[in-house]
């Protein structure tokens, strides 16, 4: 199966459009009659909306909800449940067979990483975010390798607030460490983000007000008592 490096090698000395890279990879799958298995990291249901609508045309997808950065635990559980609900609703509506896998909640690993690297005071979008992206990409790469997926990737590139160039560069670096192929993407391209908003409305999906990181949330002035109260109220429905 084709690796992104085979395409990227032909694109030296130019800014890389990772959406075009993804589409070239997909075209090769179609020429070869392949339908790969992809383990796709998702930070939240909204980021997985258009991403699944697009990718399920060409591949078998499992959503991997692995986000040790999310605080508090009740908010993690709420986002996980919303993600699981969306996968089920999407499958029922489209006839797809997307799998949902939820990682163990391990916030201590994120906290230790941020403190050990001296990143707790970094602004959102700074070095702490880079380390967080890399940490989660490594988690999904390890799981993809362990469970025999052809590719690993992330739905985070749907967000206009996240640096897709950086995320893809990190993904390619992680690919070089683990023996599993990274699937590059920039899902917000071609009106992907706009389509995600439409799908959130269609599926009545909860859209969170902060990324999840406790350090960024404190600087943002997030009211954790209210977040916890709202999350607990949501979870009591199940």
From Swiss-Prot:
Enzyme class: oxidoreductase
Keywords (A to Z) from UniProt: 4Fe-4S, Disulfide bond, Iron, Iron-sulfur, Metal-binding, Oxidoreductase, Queuosine biosynthesis, Redox-active center, tRNA processing
Gene Ontology BP term (one): queuosine biosynthetic process
Pathway: tRNA modification; tRNA-queuosine biosynthesis
Reactions it catalyzes: epoxyqueuosine(34) in tRNA + AH2 = queuosine(34) in tRNA + A + H2O
Entries under InterPro entries matching the protein: QueH (IPR003828)
GO molecular function, one term: epoxyqueuosine reductase activity
Enzyme Commission (EC) number: 1.17.99.6
Binding residues annotated for [4Fe-4S] cluster, in chain numbering: 43-44, 129, 132
SS bonds (residue pairs): 211-213
Family: Belongs to the QueH family.
Function recorded in the entry: Catalyzes the conversion of epoxyqueuosine (oQ) to queuosine (Q), which is a hypermodified base found in the wobble positions of tRNA(Asp), tRNA(Asn), tRNA(His) and tRNA(Tyr).
Protein name: Epoxyqueuosine reductase QueH
Organism field: Staphylococcus epidermidis (strain ATCC 12228 / FDA PCI 1200)
Species lineage: Bacteria, Bacillati, Bacillota, Bacilli, Bacillales
């Amino acid at each position: 199966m084709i690796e992104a490096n085979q395409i990227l090698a032909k694109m030296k000395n130019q800014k890389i459009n990772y959406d075009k890279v993804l589409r070239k990879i997909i075209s090769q799958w179609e020429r070869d009659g392949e339908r790969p298995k992809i383990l796709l990291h998702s930070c939240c249901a909204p980021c997985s909306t258009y991403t699944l609508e697009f990718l399920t045309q060409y591949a078998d997808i499992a959503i991997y909800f692995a986000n040790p950065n999310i605080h508090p635990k009740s908010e993690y559980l709420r986002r996980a449940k919303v993600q699981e609900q969306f996968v089920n609703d999407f499958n029922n509506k489209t006839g797809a067979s997307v799998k949902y896998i939820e990682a163990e909640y391990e916030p201590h690993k994120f906290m230790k990483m941020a403190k050990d690297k001296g990143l707790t005071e970094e602004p959102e979008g700074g070095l702490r975010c880079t380390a967080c992206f890399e940490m989660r990409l490594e988690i999904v790469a390890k799981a993809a390798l362990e469970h025999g997926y052809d590719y690993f990737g992330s739905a985070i590139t749907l967000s206009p607030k996240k640096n897709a160039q950086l995320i893809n560069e990190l993904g390619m670096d992680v690919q070089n460490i683990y023996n599993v192929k990274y699937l590059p993407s920039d899902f917000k391209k071609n009106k992907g983000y706009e389509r995600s908003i439409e799908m959130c409305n269609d599926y009545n999906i909860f859209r969170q007000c902060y990324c999840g990181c406790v350090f960024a949330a404190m600087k943002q002035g997030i009211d954790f008592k209210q977040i916890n109260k709202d999350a607990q109220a949501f979870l009591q429905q199940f």
